[in-house]
Amino acid sequence: MKVLVALSGGVDSSMSAKYLLEAGYSVVGCYMKLHSKPGYHEENIRKVKKVGEFLGIETHILDLEEEFNAKVYEPFVNAYKEGLTPNPCAHCNKNIKFGALWKFAQTLGCDKMATGHYARIEDGLIKVASDLSKDQSYFLANISPEILPYIIFPLGDKFKVDIKAAAAQIPQIAELASQKESSEICFVETTYIDILNKHFNTLMPGVVRDVSGKVVGKHDGYMRYTIGKRKGFSVDGAHSPHYVLKIDAAKNEIVVGLKDELSSFSFTTTNFNNFTDKNELECFVKIRYRSTPIPCLVSKLDDGATVKLKDNAGGVASGQLAVFYDEFDRVLASGFIR
């Protein structure tokens, strides 16, 4: 069976290719060039070619910059303009890594594709990785259900510390074991504000209101804030921390309140991505990557869903991905918070 492995030049994808070879698969590697961040690709491509030579596999460089720009980068920028808090990795996984790359894999005659993500597939569903500290099931929950039968996650049942230790024992790829892990959005050089400043004037002072509509302070520009943020704005006479509750992009205003005013017991989603055949789900939801799962009831509604929480959630942010899990840590569905 022929498998295409997405190679990044990092230890996880490189070891994934090695494990697949050892399991008897015919492996081909591919590095995706997604953006023009200065100095980003040259070193990665060198490492990918070195890994390919060591493993004896064919490697390809696939330029997907135009598609990435249209499907990930531009929506990211425009989301902030609309006062939303985007999740570019969720869009990238759906449209690029498990979209455009899979199409390329098929042109090479591949039967399946693999990545170095920490996640598992169980009974046709994405499942949380064994290494909970590295689990990436949340970011994978927006991919098309139709592609799941064609995906392999070689690291799903492994632990990062063991992967790095194993790589460190292999002279040809030992350098990958000690390199710094990437944790930021790949195309962001410093902060997301630096990206937005290339397209907009984000420094636009405006007013801060409380939940009653009263003007209580000033802010530096609505794009500089996300739901739940507690710094960077003034609140006259405040003795307790205040948090951003709402962003009004059209008026360049933010609404703030005390921590208990952040709480929500319900929300709705768009782009409901259902991995089951059920229109109602009693499950658990994560409203952010590292948030604690909350018991909930989900009801499909047109292309979205309504979500009723059994416990309150703080900081439900429009544009973020809500991911729904069953009691066995498997992804049942996802949707973008409205």
Swiss-Prot record:
Gene Ontology BP annotations: tRNA wobble position uridine thiolation
Q: Where is this site: Interaction with tRNA?
A: 117, 320
Location within or outside the cell:
Cytoplasm
* Positions that bind ATP: 6-13, 32, 116
| Segments of this protein annotated with the region Interaction with tRNA | 134-136, 288-289
Which UniProt key words apply to this protein?
Answer: ATP-binding, Cytoplasm, Disulfide bond, Nucleotide-binding, RNA-binding, Transferase, tRNA processing, tRNA-binding
Example GO molecular function? tRNA-uridine 2-sulfurtransferase activity
Look up the EC number in the record and give it: 2.8.1.13
Q: Cystine bridges: which residues?
A: 92-186
Substrates-to-products reaction catalysed: S-sulfanyl-L-cysteinyl-[protein] + uridine(34) in tRNA + AH2 + ATP = 2-thiouridine(34) in tRNA + L-cysteinyl-[protein] + A + AMP + diphosphate + H(+)
Q: Does the keyword Ligase apply?
A: no
Identify the main location. Answer: cytoplasm
Residues at the catalytic site: 92, 186
Q: Does the keyword Ligase apply?
A: no
- Mind telling me which Pfam families this protein's record contains? tRNA_Me_trans, tRNA_Me_trans_C, tRNA_Me_trans_M
The family database entries (Gene3D superfamilies) matched by this protein are listed as: Adenine nucleotide alpha hydrolases-like domains (2.30.30.280), HUPs (3.40.50.620), Translation factors (2.40.30.10)
**A GO term from the CC aspect:** cytoplasm
Q: What PANTHER family does this protein map onto?
A: MITOCHONDRIAL TRNA-SPECIFIC 2-THIOURIDYLASE 1, TRNA 5-METHYLAMINOMETHYL-2-THIOURIDYLATE -METHYLTRANSFERASE
What the record says about family reads:
Belongs to the MnmA/TRMU family.
This chain's function reads:
Catalyzes the 2-thiolation of uridine at the wobble position (U34) of tRNA, leading to the formation of s(2)U34.
Protein name per its UniProtKB record: tRNA-specific 2-thiouridylase MnmA
Question: What organism, scientifically named, is this protein from?
Answer: Campylobacter fetus subsp. fetus (strain 82-40)
